[in-house]
From Swiss-Prot:
Record's subunit section: Homotetramer.
Catalytic activity: L-tryptophan + H2O = indole + pyruvate + NH4(+)
Cofactor: pyridoxal 5'-phosphate
Family membership: Belongs to the beta-eliminating lyase family.
Residue positions where N6-(pyridoxal phosphate)lysine is found in the record: 265
Metabolic or biological pathway: Amino-acid degradation; L-tryptophan degradation via pyruvate pathway; indole and pyruvate from L-tryptophan: step 1/1
Lineage, highest ranks first: Bacteria, Pseudomonadati, Pseudomonadota, Gammaproteobacteria, Alteromonadales
The protein's name: Tryptophanase
InterPro entries, A to Z: ArAA_b-elim_lyase/Thr_aldolase, Beta-eliminating_lyase, PyrdxlP-dep_Trfase, PyrdxlP-dep_Trfase_major, PyrdxlP-dep_Trfase_small, TNase
Keywords on record: Lyase, Pyridoxal phosphate, Tryptophan catabolism
Enzyme Commission identifier(s): 4.1.99.1
GO MF annotation, one: tryptophanase activity
Length: 465
């Protein structure tokens, strides 16, 4: 993969400090062998997430100075609504503090509508692949989260353009099994984080929406990385090579009735999110009603005016094709370095991260001992790099039985923040993992020292076996 130079100049820098092995061992022990609990100053390169960790532009920083912090009716809210309608075509917007804020005000409304309007009794949400907080909010509201991603996503070694697609036959079968009246919503996650940041094709989004309309099931687009998904459609899907990013994004969101958005990803702000409804006034009012006590007044939703302005501007920057080309190529460059060294990854690489196949790299560690978490710890000890587990630890336990779920993939996610690290950092990361490959057989599994009941991977503590 050819190295693409950064399409920006650096105006401000933040110093980072390398620690020695002894310091890292002490820090990881104090964190209970959980990189989430490390202090940021103990991390050299932070690949935990791309959420809120990107660098804002000079245009966004200028927007911060134009913040209108009025409690109600902030002009920044109306600027944000203009950006939402420009890109998504949705007219009804509720700002929230981040993506999970959108989930907590929307999902109960969808469950209530399922019960009162469609006569359902057992709320089911179907997705190509729910992410952790999405599934968590569903389960905390008494629902069940089911995944029907294409089986091709689980073959990490084989190239396939659309490893984020729904398996349409499984989608139809799941609706038939549980009854359409019990399906609170179908959630189209773009890109599909848990399958490796993999894109969903336009044809698949269209087909999912047609199935949903046939059964009168609402479709939510979980749109944290909608720009990256649109870029892959332009690059890979016949008929879209000459379309603009705006045209592709506008069509994508025709195949949904509402959206949740963590603005901390593609729009490149440090905090914020959206819950938007295309044209359903009654649902919009219900969401607004929940927003006020849980997030804040309906024209700020937990966001400062200055952050709404930065978000309104960042939506335009995140959809810039030159930037997206650089971003996707930077991720692919790291992935190719690892593949050339014989390190198994989800192939092809997605838009925001390289996903290392820990099950293949550490075949001696079973799923219930969390091989990807063990690999994350080894990477931190080797080079001060913080990554994150996407596997059985994240998947959690069956709500009814408490039995450990077994993830179809055990992945370590190397998440690349936007406009933060250079390609030299990518080389450093690759060199560290290549060094670990030679000692992989010596790595050990983990068991719980403390296991929280919900979203356990964030605050759990472990012992090494």
């Amino acid at each position: 993969m050819k190295r693409i130079p950064e399409p920006f100049r650096i105006k401000m820098v933040e110093s980072i400090k390398m620690t020695n092995l002894e310091d890292r061992e002490q820090a990881l022990t104090q964190a209970g062998l959980n990189p989430f609990l490390l202090r940021s100053e103990d991390v050299y390169i932070d690949l935990l997430t791309d959420s809120g960790t990107g660098a804002m532009s000079d245009v966004q920083w200028a927007g911060l100075m134009m913040g209108d912090e009025s409690y109600a009716g902030s002009r920044n809210y109306f600027n944000l609504c203009e950006s939402v309608e420009h890109f998504f075509g949705y007219k009804l917007t509720v700002p929230v503090h981040q993506g999970r804020g959108a989930e907590q005000i929307l999902f109960p409304c969808l469950i209530e509508r399922m019960r009162q309007v469609r006569g359902g009794t057992e709320p089911i949400f179907i997705s190509n692949y729910h992410f952790d907080t999405t599934a968590g909010h569903i389960e905390m509201n008494g629902g069940k989260a089911l995944n029907v991603v294409t089986e091709k996503a689980f073959d990490t070694e084989s190239y396939y353009d659309w490893k984020g697609d729904f398996d349409l036959d499984k989608l139809r079968d799941t609706i038939a099994t549980y009854g359409a009246n019990n399906i609170a919503a179908i959630i189209t996650t773009v890109t599909c984080n848990s399958s490796g940041g993999q894109p969903v094709s336009m044809a698949n989004m269209r087909a999912v929406y047609e199935i949903a309309q046939k059964h009168d099931i609402p479709v939510v687009i979980d749109s944290a990385r909608y720009c990256e998904n649109a870029y892959f459609i332009k690059q890979r899907e016949p008929g879209y090579e000459d379309s603009s990013m705006l045209e592709i994004i506008r069509e994508m969101f025709q195949y949904g009735d509402m959206l949740t958005l963590s603005a901390k990803k593609d729009p490149m702000v440090n905090i914020g999110g959206l819950c938007c409804v295309r044209d359903h006034e009654e649902l919009f009012r219900a969401v607004q009603t929940r927003c006020v006590p849980m997030e804040g007044f309906v024209t700020y939703g937990g966001m400062a005016g200055r952050d709404m302005e930065a978000l309104a501007r960042g939506m335009h920057e995140g959809a810039d094709e030159d930037f997206l080309h650089y971003r996707v190529c930077q991720v692919a460059y790291l992935g190719e370095r690892l593949r050339e060294a014989g390190i198994p990854i989800q192939y092809p690489t997605g838009g925001h991260a390289v996903f290392v196949d820990a099950a293949k790299m550490l075949p001696h560690i079973p799923a219930h001992q969390f091989p990807a978490q063990s690999l994350c710890n080894a990477l931190y000890l080797e080079a001060g790099i913080r990554a994150v587990e996407i596997g059985s630890l994240l998947l959690g336990r069956e709500p009814e039985t408490g039995e450990q779920k077994v993830s179809p993939m055990e992945l370590m996610r190397l998440t690349i923040p936007r406009r933060v690290y250079t390609n030299d950092h990518m080389d450093y990361i690759a060199d560290a993992l290549i060094a670990i490959k030679d000692q992989a057989a010596s790595l050990k599994g983990l068991t719980f020292d403390y296991e929280p009941p919900v979203l356990r991977h964030f605050t759990a503590k472990f012992n090494s076996l």
